[in-house]
Amino acid sequence: MEPRLKDLEKYLDIASNDVRMIGIKGMGGAGKTTLARAVFDRLSAHFEAKSFVENVREVSKASLSGWLSLQQQILSDLLNGQGNNVRGVHEGTNMLKTKLRGRKVMVILDDVDHQEQLEALAGDLNWFNPGSRIIITTRDEQVLIAHRVKWIHDVTLLSDEEAIGLFCKHAFGKDLPIQEYETESLQVIRYAAGLPLTIKVLGSFLCGKDKHEWIDALARLKRIPLKETLEKLELSYESLEDDYKEIFLDVACILKGWDKNKAIRMLESCGFQAITGLRVLGQRSLITFNYKYGFLYLSMHNHIEEMGKNIVRRLHPDEPNKHSRLWIQEEIEDVLASDLGSEATRCISLEVTPDIVFEGLGNMKKLRCLIVDISYDNLDVLVKIDEVSQYFPNALRYLKWSRYPHWCLPKTFQANNLVELDMSESRIKQLWSGGKVLKKLKSIRLCYSKLRTLDLGLTPNLVRLDLSYCNDLVELHVPVGCLKMLTYLNLCECKRLKSVSFIKDLESLEFLNVSGLHLKEFEDIILCHSNSNLQQLDFSENDIENLPSSIGNLHKLVNLSFSWCEKLKSLPGSICSLQHLRVLNLGFSGIEELPEDIGQLECLEELDLTRSNIKHLPDGICKLKHLKTLNLRGCKVCKLPEDVGQIDSLSKLDLTFSKIRDIPPSICKLKHLKELDLSECSELEKLPENLGDLENLNKLTVLYSKIRDVPSSICKLKHLKELELFECSELEKLPENLGDIESLNKLRVTCTKIRDVPSSICKLKHLKELELSKCFELEKLPENLGDLECLIRLRLKGLRKIRDVPSSICKLKHLCWKILMGRVRVNGLELNRVR
């Protein structure tokens, strides 16, 4: 609780004399009220008056006088009982406006779900005296946004360590589990997934029970979700509009883990306002978006997922054919094999197995979404799927079937309602055997398929077309004036395609990928799209030698790539006119120089020059005030501009395999730099003395360099999490105060001349991984290694002179992986190798 209180106290800043409203937002059961109560108990003594108003949502809805009773409580708490005389909400609002300005107060409004409640209880900052603090807890962030709450704190779920402590408090009355119940306790923690409500309920329920009862309870949870948790979470679902409820159920049952944009297209194909819907679900703490590998993915807590699936199943728990969504493989196989399908089913997500009978889809007349997948282990099953037995309901709006086994779609499938078709890696050679005009079809994805030809005159309203890596594709038939609405076209590596001249007429195009096509029409395409809506353009792996100056007319361009264009030596000066360009990829190209005026690309955020032929960076690059990522990996650049420190926004600098000999001191002015990679900089002999001024640096990698020392200023890097010093053959020592880098959680040192590891590293309380390898001259390890209380991985390899490992490592409770190579002793016990 203490770290959470400190995080919230930063927003409160009780020393400040302004009036503040602070929102605490999070999913049901996440501990919002507990946190608010802890802050209230700790800080309310600093205020002249205080009021903790619980259950605002419930009280507001309980009766017509609910709002009035809440106003009366606040006035009574803050004005010594004066609230009892208030006769109506309007009068209460006026009293709150006028009576509270004379006292510095703390007010907690717990579990608010409508802005109207805030209007009646804390309508404006000017209702309150300077120094006052109003804390609002809610599941719905939009309530806070609409009320213009400036400070919003998102409650995070408990870490494993916090969860164990809370559970043990309720189950055993102590901080650690009883040894006999340790395995079962960890199972509870995994099930709860950081949700305090579940942890408290299960801890109290299991308290005093024997081990057999614990095992039975845990087995039951796998089949039947915890009722108390579901009821609490379902309050957020019940408050949704009907269409948002449908979107939520689709995410819980089908779309969890999907790329956000793909999920939006699926939901939109089914008629939902997906962008708004997902935003609302996010604000209600029902879903989250996880950023990974450059994409946003839909995520949701396991218990919220359970809640959604329970809503779908509970009306007919033993009759899955009556469920609106089917996702359990065994139930789907049974429904289809028994021909029990019904009009109740709207969405199915299944995997092809020998037990799937697709004729069973025939009764699902209102099926809007069908998602079929197949694992590589079951590919032989595809051969057994009879083309004649294939049936797709004509109501389908979204059809996704990876590795579809037939050369075209079933003749019985009318597809008049189909909005999106996704059949990547399929055997499809043509979509339909006859000419069907599909006016509703907006998106086709057939990448990696066997497609040979495609008549796009049959899909006049197409918006997205992805045919990337269709190696057999030779012809696209595009009638004149067709595809007026196409915004996305991906023809990457369609090398047998005879002509792409139709691209010149695609007036709505925003995304174009023609990499690997070796185009002759390049200049015409650029010319025809001058002043168009084109935002992303990928001409990678083409035989381009010169770029036309007209490329500077693509004023809306945001992302531009000429990677692997080995014949391209330079860029025209007009490219510097692209005022909205954010990403420029010239990696593996033949580029030898950049325009002197490149600094005019004022919106540029990412510049990739990986393994290009660039030898010199123009000084103008230092004017790129919004540049965040500069990749010089494998470049021939020998030096950075002296004023590189002027690139204020730079957060990642990759100099791996570069010819850099020294780093200008100005680099230490990069206050936003988070990652600095100096791997394989074999000519580098020295690091800047003021490296410690990079106050936000969290990862530093130095590999195969000639550096002789690490500047002591590095110990000032309070946000550094990873420090890797590999094969620095001349490095003899580490800074004495290395232990001052409090945030460090990964330290890896493999340097042959290192003689001593400073004892201060034992102060690194957050260190999780420690590696000391090939330190041939190292004679001793710090005695207090056991003080590294968070250490999980310890790797000691090639330490020729080390014979004893300090016995203190036996104190490391979390150590789960260790490698001690050579002959070493722990507590006098000789070991050859421990893994």
Feature locations, PLM:
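N-terminal flanking helix/linker immediately upstream of nucleotide/cofactor-binding cores
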Residues: 1-30, 34-43, 54-56, 66, ...
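A conserved switch/coupling segment of P-loop NTPase cores
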Residues: 41-48, 90-158, 362, 496, ...
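Non-catalytic, charged helical/coil tracts that couple and regulate nucleotide-powered enzyme cores
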Residues: 74-87, 130-132, 140-246, 274-276, ...
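Surface-exposed helical/coil interface segments that assemble multiprotein signaling complexes
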Residues: 99-101, 126-128, 178-179, 205-247, ...
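The feature encodes a structural signal of leucine-rich repeats
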Residues: 122, 357-358, 385-389, 406-412, ...
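Conserved hydrophobic beta-strand positions in leucine-rich repeat
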Residues: 348, 370, 399, 421-423, ...
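Conserved "Asn-ladder"/turn position within leucine-rich repeats
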Residues: 353, 375, 404, 426, ...
